[in-house]
């Protein structure tokens, strides 16, 4: 009898293998390597937002009340941007501005940079989570690719735009009314609705909503092997193994309606992916342009001419009036640090005068 001596063919597990096994174990909530980025960042971003909207004032940065503690509601509460004088400082708690004083840090707007940066990395972590899970179960990574679109919008609006301006002050604050204020600001100072990149973004988002509605209704309309119930919802069985709607019937229906229709499910679903993702990416590119002050005023030469020469006989369009009104109102209200006071003759007159 021969006895073979030597090392076992099974190699010893390294620390990396042990951690990898634990992180990627099949459990109710998948963790994964991406979770090391996602979970802490999401926790801190949400925690910072709830803390700021509940307790922290914006009196020192914007001259506003912005917390539930001060009487705001869900619509008016916000985590506000730092003052313009702080420019692009990261406002670290231990930095030269706050010097480790938590109260001072909150008063200076440190929670905004805290929420913005942790939020950005949290979103990136969520996209990486989709990549990681797709790789684990051998799916293609289109979910993660699609999620890159809202990440692009978040990063362009909350980080790249204020980096192109004079400071974080000009980014949106994290709140409902604050976001609407930012939209008004974009219109008045950048003529955003006339920007072709914004137009592509609107077409993408509204087009995607239309495609979703059409697709869902068409699948419901062409079910052929349903339950016995008279009602669609009682008849629907979520555990049925096979597909029970007719692509051929759907194709025939839309061919009659529009004259053209998708004949291939892959092309149909790719189009539903392509429309919103491309739209959001285009709008993100447009916001990067605005960060560099590449405004859409060039598309309304009347507005340029009216601004340069008050005596010029231009068509004083409602678009010009809207933007001038927004600027005259917001510049003084929204940028109190500038101490702007406009004389009567430069304010928009309206149609009556």
UniProtKB/Swiss-Prot annotation:
Signal peptide: none annotated. It comes from the Eukaryota. Its main location: plastid. The chain crosses the membrane at residues 41-61, 125-141, 153-166, 208-228, 279-295. GO terms for molecular function: chlorophyll binding; electron transporter, transferring electrons within the cyclic electron transport pathway of photosynthesis activity; iron ion binding; oxygen evolving activity. The modification Phosphothreonine is found at residue 2. Fe cation binds at residues 215, 269. It is found in: Plastid, Chloroplast thylakoid membrane. CDD domains: Photosystem-II_D2. InterPro entries: D1/D2 (IPR055266), Photo_II_D1/D2_sf (IPR036854), Photo_RC_L/M (IPR000484), Photo_RC_L/M_CS (IPR055265), PSII_PsbD/D2 (IPR005868). Gene3D superfamilies: Photosystem II protein D1-like. The D1/D2 heterodimer binds P680, chlorophylls that are the primary electron donor of PSII, and subsequent electron acceptors. It shares a non-heme iron and each subunit binds pheophytin, quinone, additional chlorophylls, carotenoids and lipids. There is also a Cl(-1) ion associated with D1 and D2, which is required for oxygen evolution. The PSII complex binds additional chlorophylls, carotenoids and specific lipids. Belongs to the reaction center PufL/M/PsbA/D family. PSII is composed of 1 copy each of membrane proteins PsbA, PsbB, PsbC, PsbD, PsbE, PsbF, PsbH, PsbI, PsbJ, PsbK, PsbL, PsbM, PsbT, PsbX, PsbY, PsbZ, Psb30/Ycf12, at least 3 peripheral proteins of the oxygen-evolving complex and a large number of cofactors. It forms dimeric complexes. This is Photosystem II D2 protein. It comes from Pinus thunbergii (Japanese black pine). The gene is psbD.
């Amino acid at each position: 009898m021969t006895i073979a001596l030597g090392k076992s063919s099974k190699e010893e597990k390294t620390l990396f293998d042990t951690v990898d096994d634990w992180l990627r174990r099949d459990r109710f909530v998948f963790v994964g390597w991406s979770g090391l980025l996602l979970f802490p960042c999401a926790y801190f971003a949400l925690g910072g937002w709830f803390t700021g909207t509940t307790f922290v004032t914006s009196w020192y940065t914007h001259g506003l009340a912005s917390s539930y503690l001060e009487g705001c509601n869900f619509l008016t509460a916000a985590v506000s941007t730092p003052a313009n004088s702080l420019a692009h400082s990261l406002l670290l708690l231990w930095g030269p501005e706050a010097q480790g004083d938590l109260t001072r840090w909150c008063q200076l707007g440190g929670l905004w940079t805290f929420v913005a940066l942790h939020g950005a990395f949290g979103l990136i972590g969520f996209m990486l989570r989709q990549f990681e899970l797709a790789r684990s179960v051998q799916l293609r990574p289109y979910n993660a690719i699609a999620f890159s679109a809202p990440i692009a919008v978040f990063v362009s609006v909350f980080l790249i735009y204020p980096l192109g301006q004079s400071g974080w002050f000009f980014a949106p604050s994290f709140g409902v009314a604050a976001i609407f204020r930012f939209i008004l600001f974009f219109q008045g100072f950048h003529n955003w609705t006339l920007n072709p990149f914004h137009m592509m973004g609107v077409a993408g988002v509204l087009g995607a909503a239309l495609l979703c509605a059409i697709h869902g209704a068409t699948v419901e309309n062409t079910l052929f092997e349903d339950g016995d119930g008279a009602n669609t919802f009682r008849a629907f069985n979520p555990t049925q193994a096979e597909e029970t709607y007719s692509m051929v019937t759907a194709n025939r229906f839309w061919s009659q309606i529009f004259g053209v229709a998708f004949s291939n499910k892959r092309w149909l679903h790719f189009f539903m992916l392509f429309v919103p993702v491309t739209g959001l990416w285009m709008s993100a590119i447009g916001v990067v342009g605005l960060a560099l002050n590449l405004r859409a005023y060039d598309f309304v030469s009347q507005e340029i001419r009216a601004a340069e020469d008050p005596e010029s006989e231009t068509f004083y369009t409602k678009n010009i009036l809207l933007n001038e009104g927004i600027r005259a109102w917001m510049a003084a209200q929204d940028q109190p640090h500038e101490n702007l006071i406009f004389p009567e003759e430069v304010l928009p007159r309206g149609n009556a005068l």
